[in-house]
Structures are given as structure tokens and as C-alpha cells.
Amino acid sequence: MGEGPAVRLLVATRSRHKLGELRELLALADGVELLSPDDLGIPGEPEETGETFETNARIKARFYALRSGLPTLADDSGLEVDALDGGPGVRTRRYSGPDATDASNNELLLRELAGLPAERRGARYVCVLALALPGEMGPRGGLRILVRRGTCRGRIATELRGDGGFGYDPLFEPWSEPPGGETLGQWSAEAKNAISHRSRAAARMAPVLLETGFRA
């Protein structure tokens, strides 16, 4: 992008972990400044009322883009388990209740799937990235928002294994592993990023970022 003032891209998260992960996965061009709502002093959060990851990603991208006037990238992601008809889905973070923790969510998931054989424990991580572009109109009017999706297939283990990653990683066996094999909680960050739902969504968003000047 050459010399000159930084191009600013707002990421719709207050999580430094997610911000750092996206910075690494997106391979942005030199001169792109990645910001969070906290960096800009933007208060509040949108109400995520959607029943799909795409809807909620769009809600977050629109909310922060309109308040900042900056191009905004939003992520909505979670776990879909076949035996739970796609649950916990958009309720992934609060699966075990409003005060849910990773531990309580994993404990509930193990209880829900207790006794099921490996072939009935299929699951996938899903990530949807939405890029809102202030000043550009969408096909139906309003803010232009571009969406890309990535998935990572696997199965739910019968016990927690590994202390790496976060969320359901200690229970998630990637499809490349046999039943009872390693979970994402046992993988290095580099190995996980090579196959993760977020890395696949980021790869599909890369041409969009290139077109809009955020990627070299």
C-alpha cells in the first residue's frame, strides 16, 4: 500500500484474543491499522437476535460500521452438533446458561451426548465473516455487506483432552483424526489455524480484502 496514512479497519470484537487471531489469519497489507471498538471508544454492543451465524455477523458489522464510519469486519462463529439438530449453534457461548463458562458448556455437551457412538457424534465449527463498507450501497440499498463462511468438520470426543485453544476445542476431534484421536485442544495454534473454520472463512474473505485495498 506504500507510504502514507494508515488505512483503518475496525474489527467488531472486544476480544484481544480474537483480534490477534484475525490479524494473523488475514495477512493484511502493510499500513492497515486493525482496531477494536475499545480503541475508538465506541460504547455498547448490538443485540444479536439472529437465528443464524450470518445474520448475527451482519448485525455486528452494521452496528459498528454505522457508529465508526469505518470499514468493519465482524465474526460470528460457533459449534453445530448433528445429534443436537445443529445446536448449540448461535447459542454456542451461552449453551449452559447466561453465566456459561467453557467448563460448564463442555460438561453439558458431554451429558447431552452421553452413550452415543462415534458415528453419531459428528459436529462442525462454523465461522461467518461479514465486511461492512460505509459509503457503498448494497444491491437492495443500505450498507454494502460482503459475507464469507468457513467450516471445520469433526466429532465430539467422549472426554476432555488437551488444554490448548478455547471453547469446545478440548472436545473437538477434527475429521482427520480417528475416534479417540487428538482434539484441537491438543494441537498447536499453528496446526489448528491451518484447518480451522476461522482460517477457512478468512481465506475466502481474502479476495474481497484484496479488492478493497486491505490485503497486499
Task: Report each predicted region and the residues it spans.
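Anionic-ligand binding patches
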Residues: 2-10, 16-216
